[in-house]
Amino acid sequence: MHSYTLHAPAKINLFLEILGDRPDGFHELVMVLQSIALGDKITVRANGTDDIRLSCGDSPLANDATNLAYRAAQLMINNFPQAHDNYGGVDITLTKHIPMAAGLAGGSADAAAVLVGLDLLWNLGLTRPELEQLAAQLGSDIPFCIGGGTAIATGRGEILDPLPDGNCFWVVLAKHRSIEVSTPWAYQTYRQKFGKNYLNDDQSQRARRKTIHAGPLLQGIQHRNPGQIASHIHNDLEKVVLPAHQPVAQLRQVLQSAGGLGTMMSGSGPSVFTLCREQAEAEQVLAIAKEKLNDPDVDFWLTHTIGHGIQIMNN
């Protein structure tokens, strides 16, 4: 097989709490991550040269080493030079559907797909933990994107503990086209404003993680209780992003007032989502929010949660 086409799902955060600082400059986090059906399409194809060639179609994404998908291919070449010698370089074709700089791990999902695609293309036979270990060298969200589904993520987000399949929601997703939020800015601003409350000793952080594990959100996921899950979603970064970006705060308020079980910003934003039990309910929330907002700068998506990460679309 000389090419593989893969589906790279986006993710939403059902929970994001910042515990404190890490020695490496990142934050110690507790997150609950959930894959959704909205995703990019990535094709990896042997090209008969030694080169990585990345095509992003109509997307404004760069096609060089500033792109995570390109860096994922370079990482595989560096780690498996014999496979690169045997199979040669790769053409990567990326078709974007996940909005960029949106808090949905679009770039991370693309990188994860390249790792999985080259594992298949080069017949490496890597295990999921091996792929996740490689992914962690590129970015904090990428290990989750490999297997996807529902997971609690700790450390800087790369330590994963799979949870029972939380695939029980329809999701209304919305984002301002003109607004991008810098993830480093969001975390740095949170540190400036709330750093005095950080738990910076291991014992306190362990105790807090244990409390979250035993808390109502995780219990709701264990028992597949959509109402309980949606009632306990939480994102610390809303405290800094929403005051700094009033249109995002307004979008969140409009979505929340349109119905559904629960509304929140995903990751560092600016995407906002509402969880719904059924497709019909989600369609109603979408229609009401569109009518209330009437803003041509806002894009909406209707999607649903899924129980997997990267998948082969064809072979």
UniProtKB/Swiss-Prot annotation:
One of its GO terms (biological process) is terpenoid biosynthetic process. ATP binds at P99, M100, A101, A102, G103, L104, A105, G106, G107, S108, A109. Keywords: ATP-binding, Isoprene biosynthesis, Kinase, Nucleotide-binding, Transferase. Its EC number is 2.7.1.148. Transmembrane segments: none annotated. It comes from Synechocystis sp. (strain ATCC 27184 / PCC 6803 / Kazusa). It catalyses: 4-CDP-2-C-methyl-D-erythritol + ATP = 4-CDP-2-C-methyl-D-erythritol 2-phosphate + ADP + H(+). The lineage of its organism: Bacteria, Bacillati, Cyanobacteriota, Cyanophyceae, Synechococcales. The gene is ispE. The keyword Transferase applies. Pathway: Isoprenoid biosynthesis; isopentenyl diphosphate biosynthesis via DXP pathway; isopentenyl diphosphate from 1-deoxy-D-xylulose 5-phosphate: step 3/6. The active site is at K11, D141. Pfam families: GHMP_kinases_C, GHMP_kinases_N. Belongs to the GHMP kinase family. IspE subfamily. GO terms for molecular function: 4-(cytidine 5'-diphospho)-2-C-methyl-D-erythritol kinase activity; ATP binding. It is an enzyme of class 2 (transferase). PANTHER family: 4-DIPHOSPHOCYTIDYL-2-C-METHYL-D-ERYTHRITOL KINASE, CHLOROPLASTIC (PTHR43527:SF2). Catalyzes the phosphorylation of the position 2 hydroxy group of 4-diphosphocytidyl-2C-methyl-D-erythritol. This is 4-diphosphocytidyl-2-C-methyl-D-erythritol kinase. It comes from the Bacteria.
